Amino acid sequence: MSAGKSYRKKMKQRRMNMKISKYALGILMLSLVFVLSACGNNNSTKESTHDNHSDSSTHEEMDHSGSADVPEGLQESKNPKYKVGSQVIINTSHMKGMKGAEATVTGAYDTTAYVVSYTPTNGGQRVDHHKWVIQEEIKDAGDKTLQPGDQVILEASHMKGMKGATAEIDSAEKTTVYMVDYTSTTSGEKVKNHKWVTEDELSAK
């Protein structure tokens, strides 16, 4: 074989090898893009799941419907702004689907309502600034208004792990509290005897 033919053959082989290398590099780059994309999606899913858990920790665990029974010693309000049977609008969001819901007042009581923070007895996440626990739902509270920072034992069972939990008083408010029936604006679920909503959290329908 002449030197010229041998040279051309080598050059042709070299060009073919370069094409193969470029093709392989392209496949490698494409695979890398897919891997990185999959990792990103997986992380997003994990973050989304965590966020959903955080959002639901204080809402979804709340017992939506409750008993019409009230704590011993709780006094009915003699002249509430919203009488039993009144149709009202809820302007607070203790639970998802609550704000903006139409409700019916099923009870009205004069008491002291507290915002509390506590760690559930069932090992759940700490609940900060829960609204509301009333005077009659706190162990040995008597008639004396409790002060921010006071440590108390809860006797309410609005949420799982609440009853028997040690809590800290965040704030106190003498007010009329209401028990209401309403239909969730998000799920359509009928919630009966929700405890509690304060007078400031309601408006006339």
UniProtKB/Swiss-Prot annotation:
InterPro entries: DUF1541. This is Uncharacterized protein YdhK. Disulfide bonds: none annotated. Residues 1-40 form the signal peptide. Residues 47-66 have a biased composition (Basic and acidic residues). Residues 44-82 are annotated as: Disordered. Pfam families: DUF1541. Keywords: Signal.
